[in-house]
């Protein structure tokens, strides 16, 4: 179908992704049919306006004619011919033509205007609704993607897929559909008019169509990779802007404005360079298509003048032919120039479908425990983030009892956070297995598995919403009293009292209205409210001052009673009360025991503790 619509310019393979997206418009087929009828009305009135010239010149300025002989017609064609002659006489042949002709012209223009408005409105409406549905599905797909995908894919690329490419694919489709149908109908109608007026001259006009098709094919092939690179560059620019916005404090603190500007300028120059290529091709395409049309028009005028001098055609027919051909020029030009936006549309559709086809996070679990007891075991677990053979965890084995508080300590890169990320399956092991209450976590449904954990990470993320909604995010059915209790447990009563809005005060994008310690405590309150059987605290108290840390530590002590807790900490003073301390290095456990036991061994933990003690003392002295 696409080959016929584009006269062989694009093949079925080019439009595979686009045709897949067109499934989204099926619910609106009635509106599309109505738009097609309106487009047909535009084409019909446009064609008749060209044919309007011949009777205007041949009959409009002559004396009223005698009524046509409407004898009994034999057959459909004769009947239609009688109707046409009767209509022509009613408009052009009577003495009333001084007002019937202008009125008829106004009616034609009004009908064309109504049809044009209807087709434009309906197609735009379908376009907006289709974009909305595709973006909804893309967002739903994004929610199913793995943590690894989000870590490896720049945010600018995701934004480009969901915003730019969706808009380019569907909005261009609406415009192109209108152009292809309306202008093809107009060209077809005008061609019929030309054939009716003078079939010999019409052959010359028809000959320019293959030339225009070859011209469009040339520019399509030339710009395919340029348009694709341009779309990728826009994604890179989105990423640069997002990173600079999110990291504005780092940019300002390290005087990185020049570096940020250089990054942006480099991407911007690439987009400008590619845009120039597209513009040059578009600008060059129009003059060449105009030249072909002008040559055809010149040949037509030459032959028509010769025919007129030899009595083969009337002045009215000649003028109508020229007007029809001139009216044909604009739609032909639109059809000839459609290859570039069509190429953009198809490539954008490829990007959208590629995103929709991204494999979701694997969830082969079938078990759905309501609430686990909290016994955890790691068996021969390996984790490799890269393909160079370096393991984040190497033959890791650990058993954690129900209600036990286990602290993971070690240098950066020793694998502490990897252990925490394995439990909710943010990271998948390369080998080995992990069990909770004797059940392999791979056999538990992801939503049920993650319902067993409350996580507070050192990388706090808060939503641009109120304090109340951010805390309630972990339990949407919680009431104000429960949220207030969680905030109080996280030592945030003073924050509530400081604002007349209390719980419902806005906290800004990612908690921009809060201090670093307050942001951390809001995340802790969110974890407290969830009341999960297993707590994962990844540097949860790293941003708190000493007094706040003491109060929050007390709240966490009460919260972790009869619950399993895994604590990751660099500040070893915060893990002294843990039931067991796991000392890690190079993805392996090298020591474990209570604080007193490890200090008595005078090993690796003691060295880390001494270093941590010196750092703490230095901070307190400062």
From Swiss-Prot:
Residues 378-611 form the ABC transporter domain. Pfam families: ABC_membrane, ABC_tran. InterPro entries: AAA+_ATPase, ABC1_TM_dom, ABC1_TM_sf, ABC_transporter-like_ATP-bd, ABC_transporter-like_CS, ABC_transpr_lipidA, P-loop_NTPase, Type_1_exporter. The keyword Cell membrane applies. Residues 33-344 form the ABC transmembrane type-1 domain. One of its GO terms (molecular function) is ATPase-coupled lipid transmembrane transporter activity. SMART domains: AAA (SM00382). The chain crosses the membrane at residues 32-52, 91-111, 192-212, 286-306, 312-332. Keywords: ATP-binding, Cell inner membrane, Cell membrane, Lipid transport, Membrane, Nucleotide-binding, Translocase, Transmembrane, Transmembrane helix, Transport. ATP binds at residues 410-417. Its EC number is 7.5.2.6. Signal peptide: none annotated. It is found in: Cell inner membrane. It is a multi-pass membrane protein. It catalyses: ATP + H2O + lipid A-core oligosaccharideSide 1 = ADP + phosphate + lipid A-core oligosaccharideSide 2. It comes from the Bacteria. GO terms for cellular component: plasma membrane. Belongs to the ABC transporter superfamily. Lipid exporter (TC 3.A.1.106) family. In MsbA the ATP-binding domain (NBD) and the transmembrane domain (TMD) are fused. Involved in lipopolysaccharide (LPS) biosynthesis. Translocates lipid A-core from the inner to the outer leaflet of the inner membrane. Transmembrane domains (TMD) form a pore in the inner membrane and the ATP-binding domain (NBD) is responsible for energy generation. Homodimer. This is ATP-dependent lipid A-core flippase. It comes from Neisseria gonorrhoeae (strain ATCC 700825 / FA 1090). The gene is msbA.
């Amino acid at each position: 179908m696409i080959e016929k619509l584009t006269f062989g310019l694009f093949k079925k393979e080019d439009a595979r992704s686009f045709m897949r997206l067109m499934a989204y418009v099926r619910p609106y087929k009635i509106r599309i049919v109505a738009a097609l009828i309106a487009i047909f009305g535009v084409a019909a009135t446009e064609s008749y306006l060209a044919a309007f010239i011949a009777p205007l010149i041949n009959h409009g300025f002559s004396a009223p004619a005698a009524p046509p002989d409407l004898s009994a017609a034999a057959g459909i064609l004769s009947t239609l011919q009688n109707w046409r002659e009767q209509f022509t006489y009613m408009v052009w042949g009577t003495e009333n033509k001084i007002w019937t002709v202008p009125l008829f012209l106004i009616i034609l223009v009004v009908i064309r205007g109504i049809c044009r408005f209807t087709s434009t409105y309906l197609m735009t409406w379908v376009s907006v609704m289709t974009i909305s549905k595709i973006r909804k599905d893309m967002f739903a797909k994004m929610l199913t993607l793995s943590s690894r995908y989000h870590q490896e894919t720049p945010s600018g690329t995701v934004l480009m897929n969901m915003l730019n490419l969706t808009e380019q694919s569907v909005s261009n489709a609406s415009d192109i559909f209108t152009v292809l149908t309306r202008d093809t109908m107009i060209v077809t109608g005008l061609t019929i008019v030309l054939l009716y007026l003078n079939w010999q001259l019409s052959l010359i006009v028809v000959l320019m169509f293959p030339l225009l098709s070859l011209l469009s094919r040339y520019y399509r092939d030339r710009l395919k990779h340029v348009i694709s690179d341009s779309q990728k560059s826009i994604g890179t620019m989105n990423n640069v802007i997002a990173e600079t916005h999110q990291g504005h404090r780092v940019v300002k603190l390290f005087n990185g404005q020049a570096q940020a500007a250089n990054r942006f300028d480099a991407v911007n120059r690439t987009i400008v360079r590619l845009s120039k290529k597209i513009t040059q091709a578009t600008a060059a395409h129009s003059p060449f298509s105009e030249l072909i049309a002008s040559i055809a028009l010149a040949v037509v005028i030459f032959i028509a003048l010769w025919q007129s001098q030899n009595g083969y055609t009337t002045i009215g027919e000649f003028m109508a032919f020229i007007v029809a051909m001139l009216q044909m020029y604009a739609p032909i030009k639109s059809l000839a120039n459609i290859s570039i936006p069509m190429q953009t549309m198809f490539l954008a559709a490829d990007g959208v479908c590629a995103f929709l086809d991204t494999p979701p996070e694997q969830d082969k679990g079938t078990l759905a425990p309501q609430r686990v007891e909290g016994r955890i075991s790691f068996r021969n677990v390996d984790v490799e983030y890269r393909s160079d053979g370096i393991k984040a965890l190497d033959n890791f084995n650990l058993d954690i009892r129900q209600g036990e508080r286990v602290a993971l300590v070690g240098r950066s890169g020793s694998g502490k956070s990897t252990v925490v990320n394995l439990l909710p399956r943010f990271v998948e092991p390369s080998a080995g297995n992990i069990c909770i209450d004797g059940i392999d976590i791979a056999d538990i449904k992801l939503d049920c598995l993650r319902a067993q954990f409350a996580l507070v990470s050192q990388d706090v993320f808060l939503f641009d919403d109120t304090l109340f909604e951010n805390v309630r995010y972990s339990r949407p059915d919680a009431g104000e009293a429960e949220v207030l209790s969680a905030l109080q447990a996280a030592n945030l009563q003073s924050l509530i009292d400081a604002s007349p809005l209390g719980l419902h005060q806005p906290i800004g994008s990612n908690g921009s209205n809060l201090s670093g310690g307050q942001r951390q405590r809001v995340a802790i309150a969110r974890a407290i409210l969830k009341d999960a059987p297993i707590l994962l605290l990844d540097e949860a108290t790293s941003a708190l001052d000493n007094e706040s840390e003491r109060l929050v530590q007390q709240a966490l002590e009460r919260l972790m009673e009869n619950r399993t807790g895994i604590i990751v900490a660099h500040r070893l003073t915060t893990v002294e009360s843990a039931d067991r301390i796991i000392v890690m290095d190079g993805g392996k456990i090298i020591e474990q025991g209570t604080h007193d036991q490890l200090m008595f061994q005078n090993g690796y933990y003691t060295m880390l503790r001494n270093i941590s003690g010196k750092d703490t003392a230095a901070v307190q002295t400062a």
